[in-house]
Regions:
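A donor-sugar binding/catalytic signature common to diverse glycosyltransferases
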Residues: 111-140, 291-336
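Donor nucleotide-activated moiety binding/catalytic core segment of transferases
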Residues: 94-110, 116, 270-313
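Conserved catalytic-core segment of nucleotide-activated headgroup transferases in glycan assembly
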Residues: 57-71, 197-278, 352-354, 388-390
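Membrane-proximal basic amphipathic "stem/tether" segments
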Residues: 1-47, 51-52
């Protein structure tokens, strides 16, 4: 019994010290940031971050590339979790949550992010905060959600307060502009409706760009490429920031049927924690979840499979086939999130529930018998012109 009590006491002590340490570190960070706010804001400095430092990717990446090309006087700072993340140009990399991170947040005129940031980062009057966000929403978002499985008690309040710091919010289409006003609680005046910077490459890419990506992934030139991009499920939370995912693809069956002429790239959502077991299908299925830029995966693929992910909106810009594999459709739309529109009436491509149906649609897609939905394209993709990055920076840097 005494050994058991000793163990319990040890565990309790560990957690108390852990919580205490986190609170102390948080307090130090806040005080340090407040101190750095006494320094002047540099008018030619911009700080970038993609998914809170996890990647060099998405809208911030393409705004950065535009910035170093056409605004060389801007000093660019990139917030990263790992200093090994490769960033071209002369950007200064700073570790997320480091003192340098706090300093540059306090002294950079421009903030360019695609996800929410901690509440401690109060914005000074002369600073400009561009929130690019990271997708056209099918799933209900923020203030529009009836139930948030992953949320804290103050989720909606914090969500709203976070959005009130934004000076500009990027929208890819009229639909998003309307949704963002209700889901974020922002005025239409701050929304820049011009397409997504990350989609510029989808409009402007060349065949050499495609070959470069294929070579980096060791994809044989004559093989067709299937891209699978599922989203995360709100009710499969594993840890504070990670979710599980039960892969519903029969990869052995798909290899047997399509392995001679195609491969499949598996791109899991960044919130999904599971490692994929590809035993037996290593020469057919490839886990590209950590590939830094999903846009590059779009341009090398011939067909995409997704479910409720915003990838469907971006990918349709390529006018390539999209299949929605929605094996849990009723649960997802009615219980977990809810949708902004009826996906059954307006879809980028065929919706399938069962695996045999999926196989049939893949076969059609690979043989050229499946096309994109023009109505879906016209609703969500028509303002993309390949110049969103240029328009946004010209609006922001005046």
């Amino acid at each position: 019994m005494s050994l058991f009590l000793l163990l319990i006491n040890s565990v309790a002590t560990f957690f108390i010290l852990y919580i205490f340490r986190r609170k102390i570190m948080s307090l130090i960070a806040k005080k340090t940031y407040y101190f750095f706010q006494k320094f002047p804001v540099k008018s030619n400095r911009a700080v970038f971050s993609s998914f809170s430092g996890k990647y060099y990717s998405d809208n911030p990446k393409y705004l950065y590339l535009e910035c170093i090309k056409n605004h060389p006087n801007i000093e660019c700072i990139w917030v990263v979790d790992d200093n090994r993340i490769d960033i071209p140009g002369k950007a200064i990399k700073v570790r997320n949550k480091s003192f340098k991170h706090l300093y540059y947040m306090a002294t950079s005129k421009y903030w360019i992010f695609n996800a929410r940031i901690p509440a401690m980062f109060t914005k000074r009057e002369e600073q400009v905060y561009l929130q690019t966000w990271h997708g056209t929403p099918l799933k209900k978002l923020g203030l529009d959600m009836d139930v948030a499985y992953f949320a804290t008690a103050n989720y909606k309040h914090n969500f709203y307060k976070n959005a009130q710091r934004w000076d500009y919010l990027v929208s890819a289409n009229k639909f998003s502009t309307k949704v963002f006003q209700s889901s974020f609680g922002v005025d239409k005046d701050i929304i820049v409706e011009c397409g997504y910077p990350r989609n510029d490459i989808l409009i402007n890419h060349s065949e050499s760009d495609v070959l470069k990506v294929k070579n980096s992934l060791n994809i044989e030139g004559d093989k067709k490429v299937i891209l699978y991009c599922p989203t995360w499920r709100d009710d499969q939370k594993r840890t504070d920031k990670q979710y599980g995912f039960n892969l519903k693809l029969d990869l052995c069956r798909l290899k047997e049927k399509f392995g001679d002429s195609a491969i499949i790239l598996l791109r899991m959502h960044y919130l999904i924690a599971d490692n994929l077991d590809l035993t037996g299908v290593e020469d057919f299925a490839y886990d590209v979840s950590n590939y830094p830029d999903i846009q590059e995966l779009y341009i090398v693929s011939d067909i995409m499979i997704t479910d409720y992910s915003s990838t469907m909106f971006d990918y349709t810009n390529l006018k390539k086939p999209v299949i929605l594999y929605t094996y849990d459709l009723d649960k997802y739309k009615d219980i977990l999130r809810g949708f902004y529109f009826d996906i059954m009436n307006l879809s980028p491509g065929p919706i399938v529930i069962e695996h045999p149906e999926l196989e049939d649609e893949i076969e059609k897609g690979l043989s050229g018998k499946l096309t994109y939905n023009e109505d879906f394209y016209n609703e969500f993709c028509t303002i993309e012109r390949g110049n969103a990055s240029n328009k946004i920076l010209n609006t922001m840097i005046s």
